[in-house]
């Protein structure tokens, strides 16, 4: 699993997320969702400080290399039985970990169309 991501704040323009990039900084994806958000805030505040001090030069985005993500729907948070055959424990752990509040919680459909929501999971090879 990729344990790092790149934060790329940009200047707003007429498009959505299409303006020039102010800076790019790698940050860690290790930990729960709250610690990842806190890390984003720290990395982002470093960039804002840099921008306000005049240390950043806006660079146009390469729209050919841009990636796009749609907003998650609650249905995308379902974990199906086939996932347990197709993914490792760490991959399922990461799906549950990234789908915490404020995102739709991950769930497993049970008998009677009820849902078992997964709020926290752990991977443990010692059991």
Write out the residue ranges for each language-model feature:
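Internal anion-binding site segments
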Residues: 60-127
């Amino acid at each position: 699993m990729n344990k790092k991501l790149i934060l790329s704040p940009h200047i707003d323009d007429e498009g959505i997320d299409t303006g020039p990039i102010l800076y790019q900084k790698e940050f860690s994806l290790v930990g729960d969702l709250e610690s990842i958000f806190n890390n984003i805030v720290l990395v982002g505040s470093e960039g804002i400080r840099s921008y306000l001090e005049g240390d950043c030069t806006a660079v146009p985005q390469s729209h050919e290399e841009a990636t796009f993500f749609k907003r998650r729907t609650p249905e995308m948070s379902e974990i199906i039985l086939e996932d347990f055959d197709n993914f490792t424990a760490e991959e399922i752990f990461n799906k549950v970990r990234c789908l915490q509040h404020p995102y739709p919680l991950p769930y497993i459909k049970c008998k009677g169309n009820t849902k078992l929501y997964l709020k926290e999971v752990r991977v443990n090879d010692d059991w």
